[in-house]
């Protein structure tokens, strides 16, 4: 468990202030914020690379605020993997450790068995980061810190590295704090999110809560995410109608699924079953006054709940079981003669729904 109490550090041009933050044992907490918000400086304080002006850092009840980095039982993973160039993969992971049982578990979880004898110079960016993660785990840290760890990895490798992290967390249940500016990564791996802006922790909560109910206009603008819903994924593989309803082509690793909430069911492509999130960008939603003959699997009748003028665009809130937000122009609003209470149909493809 990680507890931060009344932490302060002067950073030009603001003061980093974290009055209190608790991260439970086994929890993954993701700290989101724009560039320059103080995220990396916060991690440096936790890791012991710099000292706070005030406050305490508690790891499993012990005050580590004034301890050097090597005595804190905290590991940190940076954007760039810093590996020993003269050692192979196995030697890098096991450097300074002699726990053969943990070593075997780590390389299996990370899928690195086939690379143990390889030199690190031949590794891809994603493989290098997995090696760095393995080495971080070999010291049996109480806390794992991650500083934008997927940022420098090519998009093709990123998903595999993120999946490896999730696999490690499921098996080892390590307490983790990751900082990033990428909200999709935050959604994918976090139990809770925090928003850091100009050194202030301005909001914390479950991912859906933070994205659906931002605490301020500034937070809402930063997140830029509309139509985020929590629910449950169920594979359609055994459904008699799945052959008809499966969108094609499907991204590798994804399958046709139903995303079920208390008030609606969506057709989506998912990469896992069980709890998760669905995100539908407003631009992916088509509006129609009448039902449409379309290949899109998701078509919902709804009612206009609210009309909000936002500069040159109009935001419609439409209740279709779930409340969707859609943006249209003033001209479209007039042409469709929409008002509060108007009936409207929402249409979007299963492949346009991002799933986490």
Set out the residue ranges of the language-model regions.
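ABC ATPase NBD coupling module
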Residues: 63-76, 214
